[in-house]
């Protein structure tokens, strides 16, 4: 009976290509999540009211959903930076199963956390843009235009990170199924 490539210790080229793609997708997710956390955390706008001495200020930490978004995005960014080591390890040794399963589970948890933070922030951004007439919550984006634009922009990077994490989860699944 002839030995297969895994029995000989040879890494199949398809698994190596998946590991390389995994390594290149992680920095993209890092940039998206880290940029969105920084953009949200540095968002504020001050408006004068009647005179220069009375001002209203809008900051991201005025709303707990935005604070949760920043914390969730920061945690996911830190995880993605730390997971680059496993990604490099999989390029060198593509037949490691336990670390691939661990990455699959942690990527799924990170995607869930990032999606929860993004969804919470999206709900508040929707209220800021549209308001809610039934409970007399008025839209504030006409007054705090730059605040709303910056907050909305930070959501784009976060959702891009969610999409990349979904791709990473799929890649891990494909790599595990080829075993």
Swiss-Prot record:
Cytoplasmic face residues: 1-17, 89-100, 176-179
Subcellular location field: Cell membrane
Membrane-crossing residue ranges in chain numbering: 18-38, 68-88, 101-121, 155-175
Keywords assigned: Cell membrane, Cell wall biogenesis/degradation, Glycoprotein, Membrane, Transmembrane, Transmembrane helix
Gene Ontology terms: biological process: cell wall organization
Main location as per UniProt: membrane
Membrane topology: Multi-pass membrane protein
Residue ranges that the UniProt entry lists as topological domain Extracellular: 39-67, 122-154
Residues that carry a glycan: 44
Disulfide bridge map: none
GO CC term (a single one): plasma membrane
Pfam families from the UniProt entry: CASP_dom
Role this protein plays: Regulates membrane-cell wall junctions and localized cell wall deposition. Required for establishment of the Casparian strip membrane domain (CSD) and the subsequent formation of Casparian strips, a cell wall modification of the root endodermis that determines an apoplastic barrier between the intraorganismal apoplasm and the extraorganismal apoplasm and prevents lateral diffusion.
NCBIfam families attached to this UniProt entry: A_tha_TIGR01569
Oligomer status and interactors: Homodimer and heterodimers.
Similarity comment: Belongs to the Casparian strip membrane proteins (CASP) family.
Name of the protein in question: Casparian strip membrane protein 1
Organism for this UniProt entry: Lactuca sativa (Garden lettuce)
């Amino acid at each position: 009976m002839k030995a297969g490539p895994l029995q000989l210790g040879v890494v199949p080229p398809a698994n190596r290509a998946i590991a390389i793609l995994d390594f290149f997708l992680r920095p993209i997710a890092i940039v998206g999540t880290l940029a969105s956390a920084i953009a949200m955390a540095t968002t504020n706008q001050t408006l004068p009211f009647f005179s220069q001495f009375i001002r209203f200020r809008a900051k991201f930490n005025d709303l707990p959903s935005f604070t949760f978004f920043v914390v969730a995005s920061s945690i996911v960014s830190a995880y993605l930076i730390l997971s680059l080591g496993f990604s490099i390890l999989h390029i060198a040794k593509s037949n490691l199963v336990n670390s691939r399963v661990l990455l699959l589970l942690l990527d799924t948890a990170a995607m869930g956390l990032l999606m929860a933070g993004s969804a919470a922030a999206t709900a508040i951004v929707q209220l800021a843009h549209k308001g809610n007439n039934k409970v007399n919550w008025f839209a504030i984006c006409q007054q705090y235009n730059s605040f709303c634009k910056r907050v909305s922009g930070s959501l784009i990077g976060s959702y891009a990170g969610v999409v990349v994490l979904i791709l990473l989860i799929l890649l891990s699944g494909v790599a595990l199924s080829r075993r």
